[in-house]
């Protein structure tokens, strides 16, 4: 009896102990057991951390421009700008026709060559025609070439290289160099204006992220923009039509753009003028640029960057 009772008592105690351990395990989850091993963060700091992260995310989203639909006013302004550009283009064509009308009387064989040259053969034939009338109609011939040059530059139409070679053939070096620099600067400035009128709104609408990145670079190197404009005009890294269209969109000032263009096109123009002196012997426009001339151009381009690089270096040292 006592033996059975002892056994019963032991069994009850064992059951009680097992139930107690099971209850303890249920009350303490694995996460709660492992929690003391990890660094404790006060609840108040955890509550403050989430709003900060949300604020940072909102700032990042606001800093990155997103493509948005154009408003009704923006669409109306864009259409109006396109109409103005179309009107300017038509007016330019009328001016070209006027130049053709005031030109001296040509025979049938000469009239077919009076056009904007598309290759070196066209440039040769046009040079022969203009050279024949240049002495008697000096300013008429010059005005016609200048108008054609500015027209090509304004509307980003290829062909200005052949006109540069043509000017080198027709006129003495100082006159030809000034005319090329003047026409390039004037035409590029007009293209800049047209892009500012229409392109700025469209480019920022379709490529907001790229536009924002380029604008930041321009702002970062604003003190050296003239040097960078010289470099771009001297080298074929970016086509001139792209520089003309993109500059107003990313915030390049007009006076720096125009002056940088006038001075920057001078070194390549010297090569084109020298090629014009041997125009009738050329078989391709690529003959105008030899490895030697390209090396000289690159040296001039690198030299134009040097003042800007030194200025930025001293600026960063001063800020540090």
Swiss-Prot record:
Coiled coil: none annotated. One of its GO terms (cellular component) is endoplasmic reticulum membrane. Residues 20-72 are annotated as: Disordered. Keywords: Membrane, Neurogenesis, Transmembrane, Transmembrane helix. GO terms for biological process: autophagosome assembly; nervous system development; positive regulation of synaptic transmission, cholinergic. The chain crosses the membrane at residues 83-103, 141-161, 173-195, 225-242, 245-265, 289-309. It is found in: Membrane. It is a multi-pass membrane protein. In embryos, strongly expressed in the nervous system. Its main location: membrane. InterPro entries: TM41A/B, VTT_dom. Residues 43-68 have a biased composition (Low complexity). Required in cholinergic neurons, but not in motor neurons, for normal neurotransmitter release by motor neurons. Involved in muscle growth. Belongs to the TMEM41 family. This is Transmembrane protein 41 homolog. It comes from Drosophila melanogaster. The lineage of its organism: Eukaryota, Metazoa, Ecdysozoa, Arthropoda, Hexapoda. The gene is stas.
């Amino acid at each position: 009896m006592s033996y059975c009772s002892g056994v019963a008592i032991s069994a009850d105690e064992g059951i009680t102990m097992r139930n107690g351990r099971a209850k303890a395990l249920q009350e303490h989850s694995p996460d709660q057991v492992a929690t003391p091993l990890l660094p404790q963060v006060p609840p108040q700091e955890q509550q403050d951390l989430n709003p900060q992260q949300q604020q940072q995310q909102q700032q990042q989203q606001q800093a990155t421009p997103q493509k948005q639909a154009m408003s009704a006013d923006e669409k109306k302004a864009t259409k109006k700008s396109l109409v103005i550009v179309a009107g300017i283009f038509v007016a330019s064509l009328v001016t070209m026709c006027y130049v053709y009308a005031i030109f001296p009387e040509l025979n049938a064989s000469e009239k077919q060559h009076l056009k904007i040259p598309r290759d070196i053969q066209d440039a040769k034939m046009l040079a022969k025609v203009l050279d024949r009338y240049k002495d008697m109609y000096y300013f008429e011939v010059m005005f016609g070439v200048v108008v054609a040059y500015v027209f090509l530059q304004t509307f980003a139409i290829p062909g200005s290289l052949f006109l540069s070679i043509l000017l080198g053939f027709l006129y003495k070096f100082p006159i030809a160099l000034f005319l090329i620099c003047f026409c390039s600067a004037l035409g590029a400035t007009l293209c800049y204006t047209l892009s500012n009128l229409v392109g700025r709104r469209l480019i920022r609408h379709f490529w907001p992220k790229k536009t924002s990145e380029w604008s930041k670079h321009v702002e970062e190197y604003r003190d050296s923009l003239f040097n960078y404009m010289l470099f771009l005009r001297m080298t074929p890294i970016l086509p001139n039509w792209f520089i003309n269209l993109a500059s107003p969109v990313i915030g390049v000032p007009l006076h720096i753009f125009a002056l940088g263009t006038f001075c920057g096109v001078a070194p390549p123009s010297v090569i084109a003028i020298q090629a014009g002196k041997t125009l009738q012997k050329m078989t391709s426009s690529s003959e105008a640029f030899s490895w030697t001339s390209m090396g000289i151009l690159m040296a001039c381009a690198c030299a134009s960057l040097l003042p800007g690089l030194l200025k930025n270096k001293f600026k960063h040292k001063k800020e540090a």
